[in-house]
């Protein structure tokens, strides 16, 4: 398993895993530190790869919303869909009251991440620009 994939899986598992006495601090693929007092129970994932990985590691119950291109696994089809990609809709995301938003540097902008953070949402940015960025 590559270091990038392991790091991404570790970040996601820590975001929705068992509570730790001292809270959780993880570093995303851009070197940004994300600190939570306890595991996230309300996550919006904007990219298909992030949705699939969260579900694969048993964190599907923490998902409260998904990007418009997130359609697998089928079990997430009932989740609210938010506009993602170049037209990511911050208001739609905030209406879901997430603790954490998982986004890609390919589709979302630093300005969008800052807007979410200004509204109290932790943002984890992945490097999903190509297949290698997701899986290597």
Predicted regions and their residues:
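A short, structured surface patch at a secondary-structure boundary
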Residues: 41-107, 112
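Generic structural signal for beta-strand residues in well-ordered domains
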Residues: 7, 36, 56, 74-75, ...
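Solvent-exposed, charged interface segments at domain starts and junctions
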Residues: 4-8, 101-104, 118
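Extracytoplasmic substrate-binding proteins
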Residues: 22-26, 32-36, 42, 99-101, ...
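Bacterial Sec-exported substrate-binding components of ABC uptake systems
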Residues: 4-11, 16-51
